[in-house]
Curated annotation (Swiss-Prot):
The lineage of its organism: Eukaryota, Metazoa, Chordata, Craniata, Vertebrata. This is Taste receptor type 2 member 41. Glycans are attached at N167. Belongs to the G-protein coupled receptor T2R family. Receptor that may play a role in the perception of bitterness and is gustducin-linked. May play a role in sensing the chemical composition of the gastrointestinal content. The activity of this receptor may stimulate alpha gustducin, mediate PLC-beta-2 activation and lead to the gating of TRPM5. The gene is TAS2R41. InterPro entries: TAS2R. It comes from Pan troglodytes (Chimpanzee).
Amino acid sequence: MQAALTAFFMLLFSLLSLLGIAANGFIVLVLGREWLRYGRLLPLDMILISLGASRFCLQLVGTVHNFYYSAQKVEYSGGLGRQFFHLHWHFLNSATFWFCSWLSVLFCVKIANITHPTFLWLKWRFPGWVPWLLLGSVLISFIITLLFFWVNYPAYQEFLIRKFSVNMTYKWNTRIETYYFPSLKLVIWSIPFSVFLVSIMLLINSLRRHTQRMQHNGHSLQDPSTQAHTRALKSLISFLILYALSFLSLIIDATKFISMQNDFYWPWQIAVYLCISVHPFILIFSNLKLRSVFSQLLLLARGFWVA
């Protein structure tokens, strides 16, 4: 029975990963084609293509890691493959967190109806900062990755020089990750999460007040403008829930509370990668350009299937 449940959750994780890879790859291909065609991208498209690319790679790396680790537990735990994975995973995950934060800030300054002078100044200046913020996010993520590598490297150096046993290396490495990394990761990931939370809550509150004002002025729930604001609210709330779930799951995952040997490992991995697999579809259906191309592909697929 336990083996059947494990196989079920592994299959579910595989399907979720394939959907996430396909959706993020779709975003990158569509916006990349536009970039090649026109030689430039709008600030929103810059963030979307960066977010799609980082999520695509993160989902791919995570999927390969999980299945390779499940097949080669002993060799992988004590070898350099684990270090190689963590380098890529920390870099991509940090970049993804920052890109999500800048996406929420851009949504906030473009949509929120706030008349404070500082916000109006930010509304005017922020779109021009987007390329530099994205570049800075990549640089920060690279520095953070080097920091994790610098902290974790001695265990692998001792393994190579003194030829420690696999078990001792694994225990040493696990001790470092259990007692040092969680607090460090909490501090590092809390910065983009705080930026995201402030901007998304400001935007949700602004849209909520605007929707209530429209209803108070006689607009019905069936009014197109009211429906548009309601859809935007639902999309933002979904983004907030998925991002918060991703943040909490990554913090818990950093404590190594659920190991590969745990019965809940595969359900937990589904929770960890849920945001980067599901949120791309929310972005596709809420973006006119992406939704249009996606609808065309569905029509082509339907015509091919009927033929």
